[in-house]
Amino acid sequence: MTSTDSHLAIAASRKAAAFATYDDELLKNAPAFLGLTGLRVQRPSEIISELDSVVRSTIYQYREMRNTGIERHRVKSIKEVELDEFINAKHAEKPQSWAGLVDGALSLPDRFEINQIRDTEGNSLAIVISENAGAHVTKLVRFRVARRLSGTRLGNVITELIASQPLGTSNTVGIRVVKLSDPFPDSSLLLACLRRGFQRFDKEYFRVLLPGVWEHAQMQAALRELVSEHCLPTELGDAFLQLSKDAASGDIASTQRLEALIHPGKVTFGKLPIYVVPIQPEWAQELFDFRIWSRPLLRMDTRLVVNPDSVYYKKPRNSPKGDFARILWYVSGDKQRGGGCIRACSLLTKGVTGTVKDLYREYQRLGVFEWRHLMDHFGKPDAPAFAMEFTNTELFPTTISLDELNSILVEDGMKRQQFVSAVEISQAAFEKIYQQASQPE
């Protein structure tokens, strides 16, 4: 064994991400090493060029969050809040003023609600103090990530998490305009809010939540009502109305954008394709909520989808066409393990075809899967694969069994399906499935 071989073996045994070499023979066999060990054999220049994505990435690798137990928790006592983690000393905030704010909010539970994101040890990761400011308005009085997470990758994903789910994942909040009223919001959180559906107008940030299924006329009436009641600025209301018109005219990109902005709402108009995509139970556990590894699959009291964005790899056959679609996740397998039913819905934002190794290199930071998962499924690095980028995953409170699903499809004029691969369904079938799955158990 040469010195290079020895170092390569050590790198593989220690689960290194990459091995740098000028050895042409090793470089020629790089795909084989990747397939066998998950170790990327590359020239030093290639590693340096990818250093930003491999080492200095600001995007948290979701698979690192497995079993972290991160959860959203309603605060009931001021003792539960680590005030020092959220005080903005730069703007001369004082512990006394924060204590007064928290104490006052707790004394008015019908008007205020305080939620924290915490880890398994009870450490505060983020805080959301919200105020019911009217029939359709919720103000985010304080909306902050803990100072201990500043500059960390975990801090960045928690930032994306609360920006995407300011009021949690509940589908029962009703029509709401969420207004960011924190006097000193962090700039990175503001940017995340803009990525996650907030709209900026006159130095203020607004998010429109329209849960449920909406017809075009019904949505337009609801938006006009929000404007007339001064819940939403006229200019933003007009922009939403125009977007809904564009969607109703058949523009798929506008429909996708509209549903991203009103999440978790869905629309009956537009031409957004819908697919039922099968997924194995263990992969569903990886993608939807890391806390379920030690619990029954997708417990319906789960209120937190930790990864706002993710990627799922499948074989190219019968894959969704185009970049925009709705995905209904059919968890396959044994009913005893939580399979054999529809459990969640997501918004497809991009579909890419390529080899397993190329797609893994592109999406490893976004996905939760390790290389060995892909090798178990696809067999070899050069196998063709299809990567589905998706976001806005919604866990249903009620599952739809295979028999119930097929009854809906047969009623819609389709044949019964076993869902061994992705199946496109109609808007009418989707509405029935979605409305039934959205009902409380």
Feature locations, PLM:
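Conserved acetyl-CoA binding element of GNAT-fold acetyltransferases
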Residues: H136-L149, I175
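Contiguous surface segments at macromolecular interaction interfaces
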Residues: S188, L194-T302, G340, G351-E441
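Conserved GNAT acetyl-CoA-binding A-motif
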Residues: P166-P183, E204
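Short coil-to-beta transition motif at edge beta-strands of beta-rich domains
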Residues: P316-G333
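Active-site neighborhoods of divalent-metal-dependent phosphate/nucleic-acid chemistry enzymes
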Residues: M1-A18
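Conserved beta-strand in the GNAT
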Residues: Q116, G122-N132, K139
